Amino acid sequence: LLSLGLTRLAGMAPGARQIGLSATVAAPADMARFLDCAGPVAVIDGGPGPRPEIAVMAAAARVPWAGHMTLHAMADVYDAIRGQQTTLVFVNTRAQAEVVFNHLWRLNEDSLPIALHHGSLDVGQRRKVEAAMVRGDLRAVVCTSTLDLGIDWGAVDLVIQVGAPKGLSR
């Protein structure tokens, strides 16, 4: 479909400049050939960007023997959210997202704008959360990996992964 659209545009405006942008394409030279430009092609690589700071959060509370689901660390997660402008709190399942969100909401004595995002929520509700996040209206979003699927997050100061991620790419 993209190829057909580009061909039609080339027929309508043969001298038009084509610009292809991607943050994730694995082979930029192949993408440049796909654009099928008549003139010269420049591939500009912005580089990997700054190295992320990665740390393991040590909770002040003791880890319970069973049934904890990281809830013993929610006060520490809330304190981390308070110290940043925008935080994403990733969990692995929708059920975890609901539980973590509810615990953080109970701790939220500062009335920080905290939202919930997962695949079982109404599409309209998810879009509202995404738009509020892009505008910078939210201090934190508790979410599953549905939030990282092609969304421009804007400025995110802190990302917290609660529990082990499902895969290495996360």
Question: Where on the chain are the PLM-derived regions?
Answer:
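Helicase motor core with emphasis on the C-terminal RecA-like subdomain
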Residues: L1-R170
